[in-house]
C-alpha cells in the first residue's frame, strides 16, 4: 500500500488563526499562497486539516486546543481558490454552531472553551459558495459533540452545496448517543438514509494525527476499525465499496498519484 499526505494543518492553519479577518493584506495573501503552493509542490493530495471551529475536548487532554475563525475568513476564501486551481480538496474541521449558543454543560469539554459559541453556519455556506470548483471535505461526520450536526442539517447542506463532501468518524468503544452508530453498533436509520441518498459524498476518516515530536505512534485501534466494519457491513455492497475506498479515490484523485 501507499501513504499519501495532506498538508497545511501546521502552517496554513496557523497563518489563518493568527490573522484577524479585517487585517489581511496583499502581503499576507502572497505569503499564504506561496506556502500553499509549496505544499502542493511537495506532493500533498489535500489541504488540511484546517480548523474553522475546533472544540477542546477533555478526552484529548488539557493541551487539546480551542480554535475559531470565521469560515469566510479571507485566507480561507483564498485557499478555496487555490484548491480549485490545483484540483485538490480542502479538509476542514468545523464544530457546527447554527446560531449563537451557550457551551453545553457537559464533562466532555475542557475549560478553555468559551462560554458562548459564535454562529458559523451562514459563514460556512459562504465559503462553500465562494468557489464551487473547490472540493470541501467536512471532517468527522457521525460524531457530534454539540448535538448540532444531525442528518437533517447535513442533508440540507449536501443538497445546496454540490462541492461539499464529508469524512466519517465513528470512533472506538461503545458509541455515545451523538454518534451515527447506536450502542449496539447499529447504523442509525437516519444515517443510513443519508448515506444512501448521497452515495458519492462520504469517505472514511479515522481522525488519527501524528506529529514529529511525540515519538512512536500508532494508527486507529481495533475498536475503531470494528466500528467501521460494522457500519460498512450494514450498507448495500455498492454503497459500502464507494464509502470504503471508491469515493476517496475520486475526491482525492488517488489514481493520479
Roles of regions detected by a PLM:
Residues 31-35, 78, 123-126, 153, ...:
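Extracytoplasmic/secreted proteins, especially bacterial periplasmic and envelope-associated proteins
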Amino acid at each position: 500500500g501507499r501513504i499519501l499526505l495532506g498538508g497545511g494543518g501546521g502552517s496554513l492553519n496557523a497563518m489563518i488563526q493568527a490573522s484577524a479577518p479585517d487585517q489581511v493584506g496583499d502581503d499576507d495573501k502572497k505569503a499564504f499562497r506561496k506556502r500553499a503552493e509549496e505544499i502542493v509542490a511537495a506532493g500533498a493530495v489535500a489541504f488540511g486539516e484546517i480548523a474553522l471551529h475546533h472544540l477542546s475536548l477533555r478526552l484529548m487532554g488539557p493541551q487539546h486546543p480551542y480554535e475559531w475563525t470565521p469560515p469566510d475568513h479571507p485566507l480561507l476564501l483564498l485557499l478555496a481558490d487555490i484548491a480549485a486551481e490545483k484540483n485538490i480538496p480542502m479538509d476542514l474541521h468545523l464544530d457546527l454552531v447554527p446560531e449563537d449558543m451557550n457551551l453545553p454543560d457537559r464533562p466532555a469539554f475542557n475549560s478553555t472553551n468559551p462560554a458562548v459559541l459564535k454562529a458559523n453556519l451562514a459563514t460556512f455556506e459562504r465559503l462553500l459558495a465562494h468557489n464551487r470548483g473547490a472540493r470541501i471535505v467536512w471532517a468527522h461526520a457521525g460524531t457530534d459533540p454539540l448535538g448540532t450536526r444531525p442528518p437533517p442539517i447535513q442533508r440540507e447542506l449536501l443538497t445546496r452545496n454540490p462541492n461539499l463532501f464529508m469524512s466519517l468518524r465513528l470512533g472506538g468503544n461503545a458509541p455515545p448517543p451523538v454518534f451515527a452508530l447506536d450502542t449496539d453498533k447499529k447504523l442509525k436509520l437516519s444515517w443510513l438514509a443519508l448515506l444512501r441518498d448521497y452515495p458519492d459524498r462520504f469517505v472514511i476518516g479515522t481522525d488519527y494525527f501524528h506529529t514529529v515530536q511525540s515519538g512512536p505512534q500508532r494508527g486507529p485501534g481495533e475498536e475503531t476499525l470494528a466500528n467501521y466494519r460494522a457500519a460498512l457491513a450494514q450498507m448495500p455492497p455498492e454503497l459500502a465499496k464507494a464509502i470504503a475506498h471508491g469515493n476517496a479515490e475520486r475526491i482525492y484523485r488517488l489514481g493520479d498519484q
